[in-house]
């Protein structure tokens, strides 16, 4: 089990936008890159656009701009919330007022269950494992992802949602970066902040998530991206 846990790595950053069109404009203006079409998530009633941000330190990593799909309705059971706090009215109001925001990150592992158990041993409830998918021109992307019934991010987004791509035991599961071209953007660092930084450090160690900076502060994350215009920092809004 420890070998599986030690392979946990950053998979993607999550930027929430009020609409995908606004998210695309934000990305083009701030980062100098137009995000490519992603797809729809029928279970959650959301859709996305993607940008490759892979780097030497963070290989096979991308930025996801996500928004509610106006042409879809969440298929979650009554009372269950969408992922990434997307049903939180306070977060929604912040995004409407201030524009697209970095709100979270997702970490991948070959088996999501041991990582969930490791966090659970620290009193951190990841919720349930949900099987999800979306069609692409290259075929069906499939994954298993942790989602709480209340949709909340762990520690205000400072700890990742966990994802396992493909079917269990699949040797080379399909991943979005396999079809995302080089964008000129590279993830250089992630800073995780929380009033209890020792809990963040223990959680990262428990799931084998290396390369994170941890500081005492308001719950959230800050990502540093190398762009063709220089370094750009994205910070999550106050939680």
Model-identified regions with their sequence ranges:
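Structural motif
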Residues: 8, 97-99
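Hydrophobic, proline/glycine-rich low-complexity stretches
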Residues: 2-20, 28-33
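Glycine/small-residue-rich interface belts in oligomeric ring/scaffold proteins
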Residues: 24-91
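Proline/glycine-anchored alpha-helix kink/cap motifs
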Residues: 10, 14, 26-27, 89-92, ...
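Eukaryotic phosphotyrosine signaling hubs
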Residues: 10, 102-104
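Vicinal oxygen chelate
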Residues: 39, 50-67, 89-97, 104-185, ...
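Amphipathic alpha-helical segments
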Residues: 20-32, 115-122, 196-207
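Short, surface-exposed ligand-recognition loops at beta-strand->loop->(often short) alpha-helix junctions
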Residues: 15-19, 109-110, 190-196
């Amino acid at each position: 089990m420890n070998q599986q846990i030690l392979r946990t790595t950053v998979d993607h950053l999550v930027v929430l936008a009020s609409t995908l069109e606004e998210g695309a404009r934000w990305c083009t203006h701030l980062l100098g890159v137009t995000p490519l079409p992603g797809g729809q998530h029928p279970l959650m009633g959301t859709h996305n656009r993607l940008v490759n941000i892979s780097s030497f330190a963070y290989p096979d990593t991308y930025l996801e701009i996500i928004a509610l799909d106006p042409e879809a309705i969440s298929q979650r059971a009554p009372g269950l919330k969408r992922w990434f706090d997307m049903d939180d009215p306070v977060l929604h109001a912040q995004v409407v007022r201030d524009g697209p925001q970095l709100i979270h990150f997702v970490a991948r592992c070959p088996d999501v269950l041991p990582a969930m158990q490791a966090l659970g041993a620290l009193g951190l409830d990841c919720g349930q494992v949900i099987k999800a998918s979306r069609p692409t021109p290259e075929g069906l992307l499939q994954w298993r992802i942790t989602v709480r019934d209340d949709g909340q991010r762990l520690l205000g987004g400072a700890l990742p949602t966990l994802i396992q791509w493909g079917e269990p035991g699949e040797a080379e599961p399909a991943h979005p970066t396999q079809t995302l071209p080089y964008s000129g953007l590279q993830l250089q660092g992630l800073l995780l902040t929380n009033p209890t930084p020792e809990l963040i450090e223990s959680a990262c160690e428990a799931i084998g998530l290396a390369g994170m900076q941890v500081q005492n502060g308001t719950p959230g994350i800050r990502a540093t991206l190398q762009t063709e215009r220089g370094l750009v920092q994205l910070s999550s809004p106050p939680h």
